[in-house]
UniProtKB/Swiss-Prot annotation:
Entries under CDD domains matching the protein: MoaC_PE
Membrane-spanning intervals of the chain: none
Gene3D superfamilies assigned: Molybdopterin cofactor biosynthesis C (MoaC) domain (3.30.70.640)
Family to which this protein belongs: Belongs to the MoaC family.
Origin: domain of life: Bacteria
A GO MF term: cyclic pyranopterin monophosphate synthase activity
GO BP terms, alphabetized: Mo-molybdopterin cofactor biosynthetic process
Native organism taxonomy: Bacteria, Pseudomonadati, Pseudomonadota, Alphaproteobacteria, Magnetococcales
Function (record text): Catalyzes the conversion of (8S)-3',8-cyclo-7,8-dihydroguanosine 5'-triphosphate to cyclic pyranopterin monophosphate (cPMP).
Annotated binding of substrate, by residue: 75-77, 113-114
Protein name as annotated: Cyclic pyranopterin monophosphate synthase
Length: 163
């Protein structure tokens, strides 16, 4: 594990200087889930909410959130993203929706925070749209699955930790 890069030698917060780093292709994949009552999941899948198609609204919210990370997380760089994709996998056996986000760019810094934020905001949007029916939903297991590009190389979460 390396040093914490967001602090200087005196412990003061700082934005990492990436001026001298080359722009390379960066990809990050994150996942998370929202667990709910079976009736809530069924209604989502039937597109039965008056507010609209819950998963499509969550997809748009996740994409928008990925594009605004530098305004949400204080020391994140402003990055020109080239792709943001969200996928939703309903899991009726566990009464949940698994959310996956893939974010790409060509930049001197990675897009892990953008992928994690996309997943988180998509889950929050599902919660918001369904809370009138189910206030016991649980958002969890938000994690980085994979990242590539840059100095730190290629990271892939162990298979047993991906679920």
């Amino acid at each position: 594990m390396g040093n914490l890069t967001h602090f200087d030698e005196n412990g003061a917060s700082r934005m990492v200087d990436v001026t001298e780093k080359p722009a390379t292709e960066r990809v990050a994949v994150a996942a998370g889930e929202i667990t709910m009552r079976p009736q809530t999941l069924d209604r989502i899948l039937r597109k039965g909410f008056e507010k609209g198609d819950v998963l499509e609204v969550a997809r748009l919210a996740g994409i928008m959130a990925a594009k605004k990370v530098d305004g949400l997380i204080p020391l994140c760089h402003q990055i020109n993203l080239t792709s943001v994709k969200l996928a939703f996998q309903p899991d009726e056996a566990h009464s949940r929706v698994v959310i996956t986000a893939q974010v790409k760019c060509t930049a001197p810094t990675g897009v892990e925070m953008e992928a994690l934020t996309a997943v988180s905001v998509a889950a929050l949007t599902i919660y918001d749209m369904c809370k009138a029916m189910d206030r016991e939903m649980v958002i969890g297991a938000v994690r980085l699955l994979e990242k590539s590009g840059g100095r730190s190389g290629h990271f892939v979460r162990d298979a047993q930790d991906r679920e």
